[in-house]
Regions:
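A generic structural signal for secondary-structure junctions
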Residues: 3-7, 33, 75-76, 153
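Metal-dependent phosphoesterase signature
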Residues: 5-42
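Asp-based, Mg2+/Mn2+-dependent phosphohydrolase catalytic module
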Residues: 45-56, 64-169
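Non-catalytic, surface-exposed connector residues within folded enzymatic/regulatory domains
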Residues: 11-14, 38, 61, 74, ...
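Short, acidic loop-to-helix structural element flanking the phosphoryl-transfer center
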Residues: 30-60
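Helix-loop "lid/cap" segments that line or gate small-molecule binding pockets
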Residues: 1-12, 70, 103
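Short beta-strands and strand-loop turn motifs
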Residues: 28-29, 61-62, 117
Length: 169
């Protein structure tokens, strides 16, 4: 899509595209190597602690193959019962595959899951999977038919439980 948008579709072959994608990822990995627990988004540590204390199962459904590395760098791995491997699913977001894999990883029916996303493709994937989406961002970017918070600091166990209750009506 990026090549088409830039008017370069068909100018770069599959091998060159793969090489450039790998180079981009290598640069990204170098950049994220400096990440520490201080880089955890506001409210996320408290949310993970509250979810864990309440006995909730937590899984990561990231399209990034760097997800496990980032969790480790931020000291968050201990909270996750499963980390879905984006390389092991047939289709990426907006297909539901990664969310279905995450739910399976923690042994939970996807219909009993709530997914938190900051991108439209992720929200679409959560819906397609049959889980309940909660967006982080703006309604004009994520859709106006889901619960949305402006920032991660607003994500609390109480808020998520209320969103779940409202959706079950």
């Amino acid at each position: 899509r990026i090549l088409a948008f830039g008017g370069k579709e068909g100018e770069i072959g599959a091998e060159e595209f793969a090489r450039l994608a790998e180079r981009k990822n290598d640069s990204y990995v170098e950049m994220i190597a400096a990440i520490t627990p201080d880089d955890v988004f506001p409210g996320i540590l408290a949310l993970l602690e509250a979810l864990q204390a309440a006995g909730k199962k937590i899984a990561l459904a990231s399209a990034s193959k760097n997800g496990p590395f980032l969790l480790e760098k931020m000291g968050l791995t201990r909270f996750f019962g499963a980390i879905a491997d984006p390389g092991a699913v047939a289709h990426s977001k907006p297909a539901p595959d990664i969310f279905l894999a995450a739910a399976k990883g923690v042994g939970t029916d996807i219909r009993a899951c709530l997914g938190i996303e900051d991108a439209l493709a992720g929200v679409q994937a959560i819906k397609a999977a049959g889980a309940l989406p909660v967006g982080v961002g703006r309604a004009q970017d994520l859709g106006d038919d889901i619960a949305i918070v402006a920032g991660t600091a607003e994500l609390t166990l109480a808020y998520l439980e209320e969103v779940w209750r409202q959706a079950q009506r």
